[in-house]
Amino acid sequence: MTEVLATTPGLYPLPDWAKDELSDLKGHQKDDLISGDEGEEITAAYDRARDTLVDWQVEAGLDRIVEGQSRWDDMLAHPLTVHENVETRGIVRYYNNNNFYREPVVRGDLSFDGDVSEELGAADATQAVLPGPYSLATLATDEHYGDDAAFLDAIAEFLAAEAEAFPPVETLFLLEPSLVTDAPDDGTDERVSEAIDAVASATASDVVVHTYWGSIPEKPYAHLMDADIEAIGFDFVSDHEGNVYNIQEYGTKDEVALGVVDGQNTLVETPEEISERVEWVDGQVPAEEFETVYVTSNTELFYLPTNKAEAKLGALAAGSKGVSL
């Protein structure tokens, strides 16, 4: 019997009241973004925002609850931009969209920080979210380790220490869009699999490596299958053909995450559409018998207005309950 669970990759839009309040408290300039040493008023505002994001998910009926990552001004680069040995420089485009983040430049050892685990501990969450080691490395600049392989290893060790400090959660989503947008070349693809292993081995939670904005090229996908993880996540909004091909050709894990809700489009899917998309994927890969199917948006949700994000959460929960596998 397949368990069908509704969840998301996290990184939610700030509630409207929080945008206004934090804008007044923080300002509007690059230097006003989160740095890890915020005062009491800003910290309290983010605490209330986190509670609101958790309430959205609980009220919608999601099966896995994230803390929402409301403090992640720099999106997936956040764990580095708040680190004491990282300098933030100019504004860089976030993948191929109209969002921007501060370039994190690593100037010293990536020692344990605890920022993400502290956020997670402050929320009643059942799912953690981290950038995958490869994506975080591609978003950053190294001025300390001096070698791409050593830098990737250091990023993996840094994330593993963070994951090891997490409070107990059911699931950890490692977000790896760069496996699609900037796929690793020969040699690097094997190291990426090992880096993901290093993070996954640090937690007892089920680990989902979630990819989006297309499908992973064949060779990196084959190496990802070697990683000791519970599930791979696929973006069936951006590239259903490429992702079906990978599963048909190389198989996948016993669990799977299906990105069937568009995290960047304000059009809200109906529960019936979501159920049908999950069942369609299952029908394309009859050789696979999944223990668990995570029904999720393909991307983070911060691209959406808050009312649309909330509506998509409700549709996700209802759609997952209507799935018949």
Indicate where each model-derived feature is located.
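Domain-level signal for soluble alpha/beta catalytic cores
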Residues: 1-325
